Each structure stands twice: as structure tokens, then as C-alpha cells.
């Protein structure tokens, strides 16, 4: 075999400088026809982190304690999925509360006079790690702004083994105008702790994803807590004005100024004049 046709033993990728701009796995280089050892080990480590995030138990007590220190009440409920094994194999059960939780929430709602503007739900989802890292700092920013604007908020409802649609049942039982659920997103190989927010106007059992607005990738390396709260409050205002949410309600929140730039709206991917 002619040696000149063999690949270099180790070769860098010309895209290497782009790695400064993204955590995505690009420009990994090669050794012969394979990945170098370091990127291969990094991949295996990231995969292990993602698996751990899915199976990490939900430390709801820590979140409840943090809320209590800020003078906020919480309520612990459980979905109809009895454990993690059932939760992963039966998504439908994660979308509804178990009977004991339904009864407890009904009793709790009976003590309310008037209507709650926003029911706040926190569920472990597919990454309890995301919920435990980001719930308290995000809620601190959201609640400060929401209360300043005069919105009435429910106690924070914590749900074990919950999926997105469980917030519909909770919002309906609380007779809330709107609901938002903070939930751990499916872990990626570069983001095992990504938090998602799902917002719904007039929550009720049976709604599809078309009736929800999603704000995703809330974490330090993604969408900041402040910007996520800013976008959610915009959706709340517009939902109340237009009496709807989901595909008919677009997120056109004004992007806050950075480095002295004027605020702007629209798609940040489009070139600016």
C-alpha cells in the first residue's frame, strides 16, 4: 500500500476556532479514521451525565425550603406515575395527578376567594438536575416582576414524576387564568441541566401542545433567568389581552439592550442593517 494514501496519524480540524462560540461537538479532530482519545472520553462522560440527569431523584425538599426562606408557600403533589420506571414507560400517567393529589389540591383551592392569575408548577420532568439548579433563581426574578405588576400567584406546586400537561389539570383545579410549568428538559450531550417553561392560557385537561408556549434552554449557558422572566411576562400580558396562548400567540417580546444597543424585536438570526 502506498503510504501517501494513508490519513495523517493525527489531524486538527480547520473549524477549531468555532469551538469558542458553541458547546456543540464540532472540530474534534481525528486520529487516523477515528476520534482522538480526549473527545471520545468527553463524549462518554457527557452521555453518562445525561443518563444521570434523567434518573436523579427530585430533591423537592430543598426547593421547598428555599421558597420558605423567601416567604413563599409550596404544595407537594405526585403524578399518576408511581415511580421513575413507570414514568419513563407511560408518559400519559405523568400528565395527570394521582387521586390523593387531586383531593389535596381541591381542598387547597376551596380556601381561595376570587381567581388566581398564574398557577406556578414545578416538575422534575426528564432532568431533576435542571429543576434543582434553576428553579429558585428563576422564580425570584419572575415573582418580583409579576408581583410588581399586580399579578396574583398561586403557591408553588411541586410535582414528582410530572410531565408538561400536568399543569393543565393543576391550573384547572386552582381555577387559574394562566399556568406555567418549570420542567427539566430532555438532557442533551452538552446540556444535562436545561430548564423549560411551558405557558398556557385557560389551562384545562385535554389541551394539546398547540395551546402552549414554550421558553426553552433556561440555564447559565443558555437563556438567562432575567430574559426568560421577561419573555414569560410578555406572554402573560398578551394572553390576557387576546385571551389565548399557543400557536396563535407569538413571542415578540422586545429584546433587552446589550452593551448600549437600542432594544430590538424580531428574529435575532436575521441580519440587521
Curated annotation (Swiss-Prot):
Gene responsible for this protein: eutC
Pathway: Amine and polyamine degradation; ethanolamine degradation
A molecular function (GO) term: cobalamin binding
Catalytic activity: ethanolamine = acetaldehyde + NH4(+)
UniProt similarity note: Belongs to the EutC family.
Protein name: Ethanolamine ammonia-lyase small subunit
Pfam families: EutC
Enzyme nomenclature, EC number: 4.3.1.7
Taxonomic source organism: Pseudomonas aeruginosa (strain ATCC 15692 / DSM 22644 / CIP 104116 / JCM 14847 / LMG 12228 / 1C / PRS 101 / PAO1)
Co-factor requirement: adenosylcob(III)alamin
Function: Catalyzes the deamination of various vicinal amino-alcohols to oxo compounds. Allows this organism to utilize ethanolamine as the sole source of nitrogen and carbon in the presence of external vitamin B12.
Amino acid at each position: 500500500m502506498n503510504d501517501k494514501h494513508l490519513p495523517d496519524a493525527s489531524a486538527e480540524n480547520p473549524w477549531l476556532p468555532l469551538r469558542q462560540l458553541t458547546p456543540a461537538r464540532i472540530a474534534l479532530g481525528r486520529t487516523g479514521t477515528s476520534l482522538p482519545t480526549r473527545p471520545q472520553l468527553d463524549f462518554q462522560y457527557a452521555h453518562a451525565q445525561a443518563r444521570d440527569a434523567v434518573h436523579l431523584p427530585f430533591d423537592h425538599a430543598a426547593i421547598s425550603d428555599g421558597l420558605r426562606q423567601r416567604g413563599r408557600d409550596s404544595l407537594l403533589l405526585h403524578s399518576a406515575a408511581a415511580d421513575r420506571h413507570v414514568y419513563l414507560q407511560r408518559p400519559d400517567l405523568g400528565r395527570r395527578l394521582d387521586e390523593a393529589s387531586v383531593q389535596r389540591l381541591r381542598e387547597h383551592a376551596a380556601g381561595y376567594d376570587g381567581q388566581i392569575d398564574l398557577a406556578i408548577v414545578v416538575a422534575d420532568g426528564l432532568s431533576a438536575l435542571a429543576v434543582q439548579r434553576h428553579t429558585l433563581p428563576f422564580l425570584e426574578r419572575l415573582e418580583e416582576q409579576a408581583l410588581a405588576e399586580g399579578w396574583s400567584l398561586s403557591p408553588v406546586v411541586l410535582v414528582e414524576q410530572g410531565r408538561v400537561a400536568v399543569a393543565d389539570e393543576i391550573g384547572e383545579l386552582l381555577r387559574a387564568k394562566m399556568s406555567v410549568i418549570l420542567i427539566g428538559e430532555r438532557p442533551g450531550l452538552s446540556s444535562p441541566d436545561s430548564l423549560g417553561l411551558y405557558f398556557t392560557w385557560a389551562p384545562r385537561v385535554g389541551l394539546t401542545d398547540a395551546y402552549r408556549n414554550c421558553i426553552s434552554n433556561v440555564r447559565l449557558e443558555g437563556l438567562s433567568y432575567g430574559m426568560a422572566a421577561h419573555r414569560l411576562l410578555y406572554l402573560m400580558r398578551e394572553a390576557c389581552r387576546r385571551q389565548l396562548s399557543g400557536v396563535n400567540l407569538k413571542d415578540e417580546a422586545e429584546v433587552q439592550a446589550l452593551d448600549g444597543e437600542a432594544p430590538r424585536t424580531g428574529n435575532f438570526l436575521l441580519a440587521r442593517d
